[in-house]
C-alpha cells in the first residue's frame, strides 16, 4: 500500500496564488473565527535555542503544531528556524522552514510545503485584519519599521487591501537597505509617496498605522511618539516600551496564553502588577466575530501584540494546498 503527499516549494506556492494577500486574509478569517469559538487545538510552541542564556532573541527554531476544526478541518505543524544575522552575514533570508499538513481523519501527512513565504504573508494578513478593525477608517499614512522580507510583505499586503494609503514612512537601522526598499517600492507604486526617514521616531510619529518588522531585542518605541488615533501592529514583539501597553487606550492580542508566556513583555507586566487579562481589550478573533468592538473613537491609541499562532500558518497552508491541487501544481512524493 502506497501513500502520497504533495511537495510545494516556494515557486509552487507563488504559482498557486500564495504571493497575494487575499488567500491569507480568507484563511485567517476562518482560523481566527475558530479561535474565538474555541474550535482549535494549539499547544504552546517550544523554542529550540543553541544558547538560551546569551543568544539573540531571533536565533531559534520554533515548532508550531495545531489542529483547526470547522468546515475545513486540518492538522499540521510549522517548523521554522531563524538567525538574526543571516541577511547581514550570509546574504540569506532571516527565517526558513517547512510546513507539514496532516489529514485529520487518518493523521497521515498529505503535504510538505516551504514555510517562510507562507509565514511572512500570514503575518501580514494579521496586520491587515487587525487594521480593518482597529485603524482609523480611511487612514492615509502608513509606517513600516524594518525593510526585510516581513516588512516587504506587510507593505505589499497593506497596499493590496487598502486603496486609500497615500504616504508610506520607512525606517531601517541600515540606511542603504531602507533606500533600496523605498526606491523599489516607489518604482512599483509611483502614485504613492514613499519616504525614507532619518530615525525610528520620525517614522513612528508620522504613521496613522505603524507596523514593526525588526529583529530588535530591546524596546525603542515610546508612547509619546504615537500620534492620536494611531494603531500600532507590534509584529516583531520587542519594539515597544512597556509604557505603551500601560497607556494605550486598547491592547489586543492574538492569544492571551501565548502572549503571557515567561519573559514576554506582557508576562513581565503581569508579574509587576501593571497589566492583567482583565485589562486586555480583546483577542483578535473576538473582533473578527463581532463579539467585541474594535476602534470606537478616532483618537484612541490601540496596540496589537500578536505572538503569531500555528492555526494561522496551518489554515493558510491548507488553503494554498487546495488551490495547488485544483491547478495540478507541485510534486507528488511517495511516502513509502
UniProtKB/Swiss-Prot annotation:
Keywords associated with the record: NAD, Oxidoreductase
Subunit structure: Homodimer.
Signal peptide: none
Lineage: Bacteria, Bacillati, Bacillota, Bacilli, Bacillales
GO annotation, biological process: siderophore biosynthetic process
Catalyzed reactions per annotation: N-[(2S)-2-amino-2-carboxyethyl]-L-glutamate + NAD(+) + H2O = (S)-2,3-diaminopropanoate + 2-oxoglutarate + NADH + H(+)
Record-given protein name: N-((2S)-2-amino-2-carboxyethyl)-L-glutamate dehydrogenase
Gene: sbnB
NCBIfam families found in the cross-reference section: dehyd_SbnB_fam
Amino acid at each position: 500500500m502506497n501513500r502520497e503527499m504533495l511537495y510545494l516549494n516556494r515557486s509552487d506556492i507563488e504559482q498557486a496564488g500564495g504571493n497575494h494577500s487575499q488567500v491569507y486574509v480568507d484563511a485567517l478569517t476562518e482560523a481566527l473565527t475558530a479561535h474565538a469559538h474555541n474550535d482549535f487545538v494549539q499547544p504552546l510552541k517550544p523554542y529550540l535555542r543553541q544558547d538560551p542564556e546569551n543568544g539573540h532573541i531571533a536565533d531559534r527554531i520554533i515548532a508550531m503544531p495545531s489542529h483547526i476544526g470547522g468546515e475545513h478541518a486540518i492538522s499540521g505543524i510549522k517548523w521554522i528556524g531563524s538567525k538574526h544575522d543571516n541577511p547581514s552575514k550570509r546574504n540569506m533570508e532571516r527565517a526558513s522552514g517547512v510546513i507539514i499538513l496532516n489529514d485529520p481523519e487518518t493523521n497521515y501527512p498529505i503535504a510538505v510545503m516551504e514555510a517562510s513565504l507562507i509565514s511572512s504573508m500570514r503575518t501580514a494578513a494579521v496586520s491587515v485584519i487587525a487594521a480593518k478593525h482597529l485603524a482609523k477608517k480611511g487612514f492615509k499614512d502608513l509606517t513600516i519599521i524594518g525593510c526585510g522580507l516581513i516588512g516587504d510583505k506587510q507593505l505589499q499586503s497593506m497596499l493590496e487591501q487598502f486603496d486609500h494609503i497615500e504616504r508610506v514612512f520607512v525606517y531601517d537601522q541600515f540606511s542603504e537597505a531602507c533606500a533600496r526598499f523605498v526606491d523599489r517600492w516607489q518604482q512599483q507604486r509611483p502614485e504613492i509617496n514613499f519616504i525614507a526617514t532619518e530615525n525610528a521616531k520620525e517614522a513612528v510619529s508620522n504613521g496613522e498605522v505603524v507596523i514593526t518588522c525588526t529583529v530588535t531585542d530591546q524596546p525603542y518605541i515610546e508612547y509619546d511618539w504615537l500620534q492620536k488615533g494611531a494603531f500600532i501592529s507590534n509584529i516583531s514583539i520587542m519594539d515597544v516600551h512597556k509604557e505603551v501597553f500601560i497607556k494605550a487606550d486598547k491592547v489586543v492580542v492574538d492569544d492571551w496564553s501565548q502572549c503571557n508566556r515567561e519573559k514576554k513583555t506582557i508576562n513581565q507586566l503581569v508579574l509587576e502588577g501593571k497589566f492583567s487579562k482583565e485589562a486586555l481589550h480583546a483577542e483578535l478573533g473576538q473582533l473578527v466575530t463581532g463579539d467585541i468592538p474594535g476602534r470606537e473613537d478616532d483618537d484612541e491609541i490601540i496596540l496589537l501584540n500578536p505572538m503569531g499562532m500555528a492555526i494561522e500558518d496551518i489554515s493558510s497552508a491548507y488553503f494554498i494546498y487546495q488551490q495547488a491541487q485544483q491547478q495540478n501544481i507541485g510534486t507528488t512524493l511517495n511516502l513509502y
